[in-house]
A protein has these predicted regions:
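FAD-dependent oxidoreductase catalytic-site/capping-region signature
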Residues: 2-183, 191-212
């Protein structure tokens, strides 16, 4: 499609470090070319938004069974921000986002901060806002982790169940430092190769490849 309806309105992303001593980025700034209300839904009217994403969360949630039948709903506990370091990353991310939106390039655009709101200042106030509004950003992973004591084997087979494989983001032991769509597609393609018995030679990066 063409125009705004033909896109997902997330036009750009930036990767930054919440602390200068980090070896790699741990925070993603997501720029949205639309007015997003608190909670993530699109609002009516002109606007833009900047979302803050912690790329390497240390908090761990859980999914447990609530009964013995397939109709019993699982018990899902995201356990968000159970590790205090995740909160610190998001606080620094909000501060960085505010600095970006106060840059000269945004002068004269007529924007006003809707959330957290300019009245929310200081660590304690930001922490309270984040605790009340944090979410998974639709990227939960790891509920069927591929690891020695995990749900699936290196061939994506569910341990203890014949003929069943899992090929989605749930097999990732930890989340990728970015959106999960592309690696999830790769997992599906790899699963198809495993089922077909097709083996490809491992890709080797060029010797002169530079990494960030």
């Amino acid at each position: 499609g063409e125009g705004v309806p033909g896109r997902n309105v997330f036009e750009a992303a930036g990767y930054i470090r919440s602390r200068p001593d980090l070896a790699e980025p741990d925070t993603q700034l997501v720029f949205c070319a639309a007015f997003r209300k608190p909670g993530g839904t699109l609002g009516v009217g002109h606007g833009y938004a900047l979302g803050i994403v912690g790329l390497k969360p240390k908090s761990r949630g859980s999914i447990t069974l609530s009964g013995s039948t397939i109709s019993d709903q699982p018990i899902i506990d995201p356990n968000l921000l159970s590790d205090e370091s995740d909160l610190e990353v998001l606080i620094e991310g909000v501060n960085a986002g505010r600095r970006v939106l106060s840059a000269p390039a945004f002068e004269g655009k007529g924007h006003a901060e809707i959330a957290p709101g300019t009245h929310v200042q200081g660590r304690q106030a930001l922490a309270e806002h984040i605790r009340n509004s944090v979410n998974t950003a639709f990227h939960p992973v790891g509920t069927c982790a591929m690891k020695p004591d995990g749900v699936v084997s290196g061939e994506l087979k569910v341990r203890g169940v014949d003929g069943l494989r899992v090929a989605d983001a749930s097999i990732m032991p930890t989340i990728t430092s970015g959106n999960t769509h592309a690696p999830t597609v790769m997992i599906g393609e790899k699963c198809a190769d495993l089922i077909r018995g097709r083996t490809l030679e491992a890709w080797q990066p060029p010797a002169d490849l530079e990494t960030v």
